[in-house]
């Protein structure tokens, strides 16, 4: 471990300048800067001055949402212990030590720029790996859903579906019984239809009265009876006329005697 990454206040050594910078910030939180003489710079005299490392200065413009490193509880407890040991020092000496530590920290962070670029590359690789992992998980879930759907389709193909009402049954026997109920309903419907047709025909025949001689139809029996009487009178007239024709003299026959003439005149 190099000596340049050592804290000038508590003489702790660190692996890189970034860790040393975080440690120096803890010193600034525990030991606020006193009123500085005019020889110190305005930045050091500002009570709101906060020590930042090289990475936070360069990346604040690029990645403002990136979180800074947090203090460890163990380091805070050690700093409190160091504070109790350094109470004997004067405030001016502590301020001078802080200024020297800040200068050395800035120099060490300048030299450690390649390390920050390497860490950025590692972070980028981690992000890419995380994205690939999420994509692979999404693809796995989609395949899982597709397999469930295919399994359901295969299971449905094993079932038996009624073509009339689209009901599904687990066995062919159940489907056969269901189809029998459909056939029974159809037969009952056909029987009702035939009965209704017969009734309609019967009503139509009973409501109409047809003459057997000329096939005329009448709405009532009385009208049909009057029509039949007309047929009877016509028959009598035809018979009478036929009798008259028979009683005529035939020139081809011999002349009748007087007795036959008297008999024909009586009729």
From Swiss-Prot:
InterPro entries: ZAT1/4/9 (IPR044303), Znf_C2H2_sf (IPR036236), Znf_C2H2_type (IPR013087). Residues 52-62, 83-97 have a biased composition (Basic and acidic residues). A zinc finger (C2H2-type) spans 5-27, 160-182, 209-231. It comes from the Eukaryota. GO terms for biological process: regulation of DNA-templated transcription. GO terms for cellular component: nucleus. Keywords: Metal-binding, Nucleus, Repeat, Transcription, Transcription regulation, Zinc, Zinc-finger. Its main location: nucleus. Pfam families: zf-C2H2_6. Residues 34-99, 181-204 are annotated as: Disordered. It is found in: Nucleus. Residues 63-73 have a biased composition (Basic residues). The keyword Transcription regulation applies. GO terms for molecular function: DNA-binding transcription factor activity; zinc ion binding. PANTHER family: ZINC FINGER PROTEIN ZAT1-RELATED. Probable transcription factor that may be involved in stress responses. This is Zinc finger protein ZAT1. It comes from Arabidopsis thaliana.
């Amino acid at each position: 471990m190099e000596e340049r990454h050592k804290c000038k206040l508590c003489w702790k050594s660190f692996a890189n300048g970034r860790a040393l910078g975080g440690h120096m910030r803890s010193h600034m939180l525990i030991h606020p800067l006193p009123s500085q003489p005019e020889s110190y710079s305005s930045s050091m005299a500002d009570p709101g001055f906060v020590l930042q490392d090289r990475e936070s200065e360069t990346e604040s413009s690029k990645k403002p949402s990136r979180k800074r490193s947090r203090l460890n509880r163990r380091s805070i407890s050690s700093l409190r212990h160091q504070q109790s040991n350094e109470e004997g020092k004067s405030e001016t000496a502590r301020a001078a030590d802080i200024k020297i530590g800040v200068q050395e920290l800035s120099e060490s962070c300048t030299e450690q720029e390649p390390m920050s670029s390497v860490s950025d590359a590692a972070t980028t690789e981690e992000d890419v790996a995380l994205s690939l992992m999420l994509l692979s998980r999404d693809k796995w879930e989609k395949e899982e859903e597709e397999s469930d759907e295919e399994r359901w389709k295969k299971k449905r193909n094993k079932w038996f579906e009624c073509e009339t009402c689209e009901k599904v049954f687990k066995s062919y026997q159940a489907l056969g019984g269901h189809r029998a109920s459909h056939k029974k309903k159809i037969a009952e419907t056909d029987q009702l239809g035939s009965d209704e047709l017969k009734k309609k025909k019967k009503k139509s025949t009973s409501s109409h009265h047809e003459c057997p001689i000329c096939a005329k139809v009448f709405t009532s029996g009385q009208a049909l009876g009057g029509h039949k009487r007309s047929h009877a009178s016509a028959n009598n007239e035809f018979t009478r006329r036929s009798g008259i024709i028979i009683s005529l003299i035939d020139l081809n026959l011999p002349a009748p005697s007087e007795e036959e003439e008297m008999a024909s005149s009586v009729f």
